[in-house]
């Protein structure tokens, strides 16, 4: 096995850079020698992953947060084709949310992820694909391992990316605070959507998501019935809802008891298409 470790030192508001000497030592004990690459800016992980695969790496270990893991994943795939089908992707979560590993039953401590790598068996999982219109009006493609969402969640991510609260709050509290802060300025939005090959319908939604994994937003148990390898995505659309009712029901999403709420549209899908005359944040 030829291993390349790709680190985002900025993950977790710079926490990963401080932890790296300890993570590096633990990784060497767990998986043996490896090559190291560090990202400097957004998008670097995609390019570094592709170069590592071209140079013969058969295992890539992403060290950082969920966003970094997603970038590394996107380095594995180009035009819907895996660059090296024999290569595997592993991770050590040291970012803000650390949500994807929860779907695999790994607790939040990075030491546990490193320990899992020692005798890890390769598991095949599904990957979702998003085609979207970027802010510059160009068409983009992004692959995802965990959850793709739009609406309030996109606004929350934008808030966190531009906030220094991550220096003071842990992942769960940071996402909770950002959600409460953002929801006051984020309205229900009108979208037109189609599920699989069904008819086009319309809905007012504050938040919609397609889930491969079960958790997002710093431990929100958003999709308790999602499976990583069932060939399906769990669609959840939060219908038109008042601000007061949204805040009242918010604790349920941490427990995974929200699916039966009348304000939630839930079903298993293979394909979902949505469009809006409004700007909707992914």
What are the residue ranges of the model-derived segments?
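ATP/NTP phosphate-donor binding region
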Residues: 1-63, 70, 74, 111, ...
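Short amphipathic alpha-helical segments
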Residues: 17-19, 73-76, 102-104, 221-222
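Short, solvent-exposed amphipathic alpha-helical segments in soluble enzyme
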Residues: 20-22, 53, 77-78, 161-162, ...
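Catalytic core of DAGKc-family lipid kinases
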Residues: 30, 77-206
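Glycine-rich phosphate/pyrophosphate-binding beta-alpha loops
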Residues: 149, 153, 209-222
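ATP/nucleoside-binding phosphotransfer catalytic cores, i.e., glycine-rich phosphate-binding loops
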Residues: 195-197, 202, 221-222, 227-282
């Amino acid at each position: 096995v030829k291993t390349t470790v790709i680190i985002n030192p900025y993950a977790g508001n710079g926490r990963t850079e401080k932890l790296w000497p300890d993570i590096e030592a633990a990784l060497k004990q767990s998986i043996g020698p490896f090559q190291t690459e560090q990202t400097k800016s957004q998008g670097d992980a995609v390019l570094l992953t592709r170069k590592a695969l071209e140079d013969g790496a058969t295992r890539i270990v992403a060290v950082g947060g969920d966003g970094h893991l997603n970038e590394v994943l996107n380095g594995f795939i180009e035009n819907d084709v895996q660059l090296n089908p024999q290569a595997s992707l592993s991770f050590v979560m040291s970012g803000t949310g650390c949500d994807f590993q929860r779907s695999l039953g790994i607790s939040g401590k990075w030491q546990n992820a490193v320990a899992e790598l020692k005798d890890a068996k390769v598991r095949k999982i599904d990957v979702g694909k998003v085609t979207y219109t970027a802010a510059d009006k160009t068409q983009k493609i992004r692959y995802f391992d965990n959850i793709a969402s739009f609406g309030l969640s996109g606004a929350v991510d934008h808030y966190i990316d531009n906030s220094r609260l991550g220096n003071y709050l842990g992942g769960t509290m940071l996402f909770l605070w950002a959600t409460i802060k953002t929801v006051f300025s984020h309205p229900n939005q009108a979208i037109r959507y189609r599920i699989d090959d069904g008819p086009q319908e319309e809905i007012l939604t504050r938040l919609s998501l397609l889930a491969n994994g079960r958790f997002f937003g710093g431990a929100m148990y958003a999709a308790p019935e999602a499976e990583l390898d069932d060939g399906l995505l769990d669609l959840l659309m939060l219908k038109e809802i008042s601000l007061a009712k949204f805040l009242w029901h918010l604790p349920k999403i941490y427990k995974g008891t929200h699916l039966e709420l009348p304000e939630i549209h839930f079903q298993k899908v293979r394909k979902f298409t949505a469009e809006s005359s409004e700007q909707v944040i992914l």
